[in-house]
Amino acid sequence: MTTTTSRLDAQIEKHLGLIDSLSARFALPLHVFFVEEMEANAEAFRSVAAAQYPRTAIAFAVKSNPCRGAVRLAARFGLGADVASEYELQLALEEHMEPATILCNGNAKSDDYLARAVSAGCPIAVDNADELDALDALLRGTGRKAQVLLRFRGMPLAGLTSDDQTTAADWTKFGFHIDEAPALFARLAEAATLRFLGISAHIGTQIAEPGGYERLLDHLLDVARDAQSRGLDVEMIDVGGGFPVSFLSEDEWTAFQASLLARLRGDVGASGAVTWNDIPMGYARTAGDQDSTWIGKAYWSRVPIARMYQHLLCAITRNGRSVVERLHALGDPTLVIEPGRSLMANAGITLTEVMGVKRVLEHAVVSLDMGINNHGTNLISPDIFPAAVLPRRESDVPETAFLAGRLCFSGDMISKAKVKLNRLPRRGERFVLYHTGAYSADHFASNSCGFPRPAKVAIRPGGTAELWRAPETYGSVHGASAEDLTIRDV
């Protein structure tokens, strides 16, 4: 147990009988979410907003856990939604979220997505000029207007984190460059089919240090002021999400970084490897030397979850005023935040079964009855998730191990960083991965190697459960052997 898993361990202990029953009914692997933990995270954001900037709108990033159960909870907790497709939009509307609280995002919105957003009256974060043209063509002559924000990139955020984690610097597929703002504002001021609501940007994901957020907000507030100076009303500023979660404790995180850096510099031998095949993760070589600067996904933050938002509202910007003071000067626009990982990650676990343990170059490798398609964030960047063998025993002797998946390709590693386990397991023992409530179950989920996707269940505080996704079966994935595959009437 680490300090970051103590709450989840308490939930497992509290609901152990129910978890056993759910595991027997739906089989392993099994994604389990705890409603109480998600609600605590939502309440933390609501409390910060109420105390420091009540004109905050909290929009749950549906892509972090795209299922009806999670969206229904978000609606019950009084949240809106950040949606990234027409299907997420439909889900949010079906769960009775107010259209004005559903932010429609995405860099490649279909005509259908745009039409649905306009019909419902949802704000649209416009990504590019073609989207503006598409909206204009859709609405020309109707007397109606689309509610739009302009999404921007090009803020000075280079070196903040790895390229696959940031979405507001220069090298990103999202948004207009901030240099385009004056021309865009001029177009919106004259548009007959577009109603300007405000501006938008999204810094990225799992941003552990506040400095990048401070730079982003500083520039966004400047852009908002420029829009006002050109006669536009700025009713809304959407700063996105990316609020961090501490997967590890501070001591665990700094120890991992120190061990990895020592290995990459050659200070320790092969037995001291802490990543698979010595992948550098957030470290990079420069001019032939091993740089000691970590640029990549971080697994601990001094201001996790809602504490990051609290810090940002109080942050002092370049002109010497706090973010809240500058918002007041702009007329108190609605400030939209889009938490996803920070609401869901530490509300979930994944249970699976151990298939075997072997040694590879002196290192323990635990093979699990799940694949990277059930833990998809690893396909973006190598992740570090705490894990344990169940049940825990007083006689446990801690060991470190790499975690391997069951898919038939060598990149299927559940953890390319060595994970500290309470003991080395045996085949057939139950195994838990912590903090898998966001993205893991759904991001890149697939039927690789013919495996069905596992069930997702949620446990309520009172000890009852919800089925968030039924487990797929052989038949639902592959069909029946007698099925006629001919396409007719085409």
Question: Which residues does each PLM region occupy?
Answer:
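Active-site-proximal loop/turn and secondary-structure-junction residues that shape catalytic pockets
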Residues: 64-66, 87, 108-110, 128-130, ...
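Generic secondary-structure signature for well-ordered alpha-helical cores
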Residues: 43, 47-51, 140, 144, ...
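Structural preference for beta-strand elements that scaffold enzyme active sites
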Residues: 57-59, 78-80, 101-103, 123, ...
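A charged N-terminal "starter" segment
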Residues: 1-147, 191, 195, 229, ...
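Distinct, well-ordered alpha-helical segments
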Residues: 70-73, 92-95, 135-140, 161-163, ...
